[in-house]
A protein has these predicted regions:
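A cross-kingdom feature marking charged/low-complexity
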Residues: 38, 42-64
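Short, well-ordered alpha-helical segments
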Residues: 2-35
Length: 64
């Protein structure tokens, strides 16, 4: 079995968990058999002292 790792970014206005899920949902439209996700880091976009956007950088493992 061969495993490939793909790096991607998920975004959400609701939170980091939703940002991760957004990335997995979007990737699963084109990538079959996702077997795991490593969150590399989280970042946020801030406006007027408030977080308005969340980003999660991921490494996704999937079967090839």
């Amino acid at each position: 079995m061969h495993i490939k790792v793909t790096e991607l970014v998920g975004e959400s206005s609701a939170g980091w968990k939703d940002a991760v899920q957004s990335a997995v949902t979007e990737a699963s439209r084109n990538i079959n058999e996702i077997v795991g996700v490593e969150v590399v880091n989280f970042t946020a976009h801030v406006e007027n002292g408030r977080i308005v956007g969340y980003k999660a950088n991921l490494k996704m493992a999937h079967k090839q």
